[in-house]
Amino acid sequence: MRTLWIVALLLVGVEGSVLELGKMILQETGKNAITSYGSYGCNCGWGHRGQPKDATDRCCFVHKCCYKKLTDCNHKTDRYSYSWKNKAIICEEKNPCLKEMCECDKAVAICLRENLDTYNKKYKAYFKLKCKKPDTC
């Protein structure tokens, strides 16, 4: 029962496409998005603080750049629809901006899967103040 209460509290703070993104990452990598990538390197999770530490961190950097291109929707509050068919993510949105947001999330999930071999536990809870000079998109 205590575990259910903790999960409920965590979900209260989750908005918009974060839920969909988390599902995509789990489906593509087998890893929990929050515990594995929530504070990974300089660019995964909240904050965009510096040059990527490795290829995994670069996936998150490119994802943030993709989100910056979205002008008509908000990745923090807007939600989209997608499906998982034959181990593939299918963005099903009719709304162009929501479809693009879904494509951004799909791309990062695939990138993280393709770079699982670069995942380094020393960057899992990286102290972001160590990050230097942000890369530009």
UniProtKB/Swiss-Prot annotation:
The record marks K121, K124 as: Important residue of the cationic membrane-docking site (MDoS). InterPro entries: PLipase_A2 (IPR001211), PLipase_A2_Asp_AS (IPR033112), PLipase_A2_dom (IPR016090), PLipase_A2_dom_sf (IPR036444), PLipase_A2_His_AS (IPR033113). This is Basic phospholipase A2 homolog APL-K49. It is found in: Secreted. Snake venom phospholipase A2 (PLA2) that lacks enzymatic activity. Does not show antibacterial activity. Is myotoxic and displays edema-inducing activities. A model of myotoxic mechanism has been proposed: an apo Lys49-PLA2 is activated by the entrance of a hydrophobic molecule (e.g. fatty acid) at the hydrophobic channel of the protein leading to a reorientation of a monomer. One of its GO terms (cellular component) is extracellular region. Coiled coil: none annotated. It comes from Agkistrodon piscivorus leucostoma (Western cottonmouth). It comes from the Eukaryota.
